[in-house]
């Protein structure tokens, strides 16, 4: 294949994207499979152009705290170094007082958001009810800190509660919302292709269930985020299938005028350093490959940007320097201060667990772009 025969389709695709049109899945795959550095530079420039057009030059961040309330989990995802059995060394399960104390510390430090998720612990019940356990945490947090935005419980956790108690997803989500949950994290998405999920997270909900729960949340008025775990066994085609499903889910929310939608897309590159050996050995790397992550970051902006405008890198996984570079590849948000983080750190990530507002603002300023604190839903 000649150089010009490779260049022509890529430039045509990028011109189409710049015109404001949505790309097809096939066109996105062509971009991801591009290896010519000159063309990759054009992909970056197009993503940066669209980012500027769709969200402006301001880079946002949120002052938040992660609270991972337990790592006791019934599942055994092949990428996860966080989960433990109840009697295993390193297992933890925070009580209500400890959770409230962490939230109080976060509020003292200026946090507007608590992001809360945990392992799937069948013993986390009150009088035999899983939902009641989660509701007790939420009600006590909101009673103590009514103005705090509670971004809590992934679609996987919603399904777990529903299964344990024999409830519908709608009942679980509505109950959490009524108790004070303000939005759901779009984690546990990993790759929304069941062929991949059967290898990396066979016990997790399938792609259709993840999408159903997210759609139900939107219909009930709860915003969600969206994520993708990349850089392991998935192919470019499977990456695009994932993006396509997220875009379609957002289009459903927009076309039906649901009261809520997907607020952001976050790319989460696989960190293998301390991950279980089978997947770590199969992937053959301990830390993310920055160049691959940046190219996918750009293609995600180009493919999703018309419907999901806010794109965020993971500084925990890429480090602050890598995440700052992603702001040149289509991202417009640098995420949160976190204050603590266990899931990725236990997998061996080198990005750290806490950044100050000053550190985030300095990183943004290094690009000569203005910084602005935001709330959870932008």
Swiss-Prot record:
GO MF: 4 iron, 4 sulfur cluster binding; 5-amino-6-(D-ribitylamino)uracil--L-tyrosine 4-hydroxyphenyl transferase activity; 7,8-didemethyl-8-hydroxy-5-deazariboflavin synthase activity; iron ion binding
Keyword annotations from UniProtKB, A to Z: 4Fe-4S, Iron, Iron-sulfur, Metal-binding, S-adenosyl-L-methionine, Transferase
InterPro entries according to UniProt: Aldolase_TIM, CofH/MnqC-like_C, CofH_family, F420, FO_synthase_su2, rSAM
Binding of [4Fe-4S] cluster, residues: 73, 77, 80
Ranges of residues in domain Radical SAM core: 59-306
SUPFAM superfamilies the UniProt entry points to: Radical SAM enzymes (SSF102114)
Pathway: Cofactor biosynthesis; coenzyme F0 biosynthesis
Reactions listed under catalytic activity: 5-amino-6-(D-ribitylamino)uracil + L-tyrosine + S-adenosyl-L-methionine = 5-amino-5-(4-hydroxybenzyl)-6-(D-ribitylimino)-5,6-dihydrouracil + 2-iminoacetate + 5'-deoxyadenosine + L-methionine + H(+)
Needed cofactors: [4Fe-4S] cluster
EC number: 2.5.1.147
Pfam families: CofH_C, Radical_SAM
Cofactor note: Binds 1 [4Fe-4S] cluster. The cluster is coordinated with 3 cysteines and an exchangeable S-adenosyl-L-methionine.
Family designation: Belongs to the radical SAM superfamily. CofH family.
Subunit structure: Consists of two subunits, CofG and CofH.
Described purpose of this protein according to its UniProt entry: Catalyzes the radical-mediated synthesis of 5-amino-5-(4-hydroxybenzyl)-6-(D-ribitylimino)-5,6-dihydrouracil from 5-amino-6-(D-ribitylamino)uracil and L-tyrosine.
Protein's UniProt name: 5-amino-6-(D-ribitylamino)uracil--L-tyrosine 4-hydroxyphenyl transferase
Source organism (scientific name): Microcystis aeruginosa (strain NIES-843 / IAM M-2473)
Gene that specifies this protein: cofH
